[in-house]
Amino acid sequence: MKDQFVIAYLADFSMTQEVVSHACHMARMLNKGLILLYIEDSRYHLPSVDEAEKTLLRLEKEHPDVNPAHVALKGNTREIINALPTLLNGVVAVAGIDTHARIGSLCNPKRVLHNFAQCKIAYLTVQQPLADPTPYSNVAFSIDFHKESKEKLIWASYFARFNHSRLRMLHFQYNDPGLHNKWHNNVLFMDKFFSGLKVTYDTLTVEGRALFPETIVCRTAADAGCSLLVSVTTDTRNRDVIEWFVGAQEDRIVRNPRQLPILFINPRNDIYVLCD
């Protein structure tokens, strides 16, 4: 019996295949259980818990290899998502993104980011079903001059260790000596962390400049054949004026036209170590 779970968040069942296919692979990769989660929230026009149970039971039978369980709850979507680590022993969630969904839809990109904004576990946003026979074979992440997220490196290492993924570290060229020094220190920190786990990576230089650098990182990762990007969301405590008015980087890469799955990690003060 598994005691930690990948959470397949089936918002309104409109992206069931997309979410479940990725969640099943994550459960196998991490050797965790799988929970199919449905939330009946009175603020949205959704099937009742009783109606949802029928679909959830059918989905359980369709995936005997991972032996999923299901949970159907009533309540506030965001509050339940925030409680996933303690409520369901969740370690990572998978959510579907529909770039054509109306703003009030639970699968609308902005709505997904809003509902997961305070989530303490990583969450994978997906736009299409997992069809690759070797899923996540190339996983990208970027290193810049900002304070490095150890949890991002931990998650990147999971893909290398448990999925045998090839890691691609993307970075910009910094002409400013101060920024270059900060970036170099982050690389040294990463190298020390990865060396202890015997994890290797390739480097890829990102060309160009943009108001939101992660959008170029996302495009470069897709062009390089990467099948997943690990990204840290903007700390709301540190947002500048531009970000408050035009949005943060995650608002753009979540709906990337190449449909690259994005594993988002919200900034947090503590580190949640999932696997040894």
Regions found by a protein language model. Give the residues of each.
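Small/aliphatic-rich secondary-structure junction motif
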Residues: 1-48, 138-182, 192-203, 256-257
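General small-molecule cofactor/ligand-binding pocket signal
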Residues: 35-37, 69-73, 124, 168-170, ...
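Short, well-ordered secondary-structure micro-motifs
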Residues: 47, 105-106, 152, 178-182, ...
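A short helix-to-beta-strand connector/capping loop
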Residues: 61-69, 197-204
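Gly/Ser-rich helix-loop-strand patches that form or flank binding pockets
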Residues: 80-132, 221-276
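Glycine/small-residue-rich hydrophobic helix-like segments
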Residues: 181-238
